[in-house]
Amino acid sequence: MPVGFLGDPLIRLRAIAVAHPDHPLHKLGRKLSHRDLRAHRHLVVRESGTQRTTRALTVEATQRWTVSHLATSVQAARMGYGFAWYPEDAIRDELAQGTLKPLRLREGEVRFAELYLIIAERDDPGPGTLRLARIIREAVKSECPKEMTTAA
């Protein structure tokens, strides 16, 4: 959330570390350390914010591929080019089909990211802002799995 703003939580995303089933990290046959991860290519989706300071789903690695879209990163992981943390909901098909497999980590196997609804002019929002906020809340309530939603 940007500094100086308040917001209402909408969705809590659960992200898991994954790689192709034949990736060398899976072949180690044990829980992985951050040192293990640093020795392999980390796939990262570029942040769209102006400050780009979030490191919620990244780890320092000797090699990193940064791409613009989640789908591109998932495809690279499916092809065995690296590992990444992805929102579990976004890779359900790949997990079910076995094209991606969760990595067993000593720590950090699962990470969470929160999505907030922020209204900049909270004290005096216009009718359009209020309507859009209501539409967003309704869409989250009807389209997102209940376990993901945090909105009242």
Residue ranges and their predicted role:
Residues 2-81, 86-111, 130, 134, ...:
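C-terminal regulatory
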Residues 18-22, 114-125:
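A bilobed periplasmic-binding-protein/Venus flytrap-type ligand-binding module shared by bacterial periplasmic
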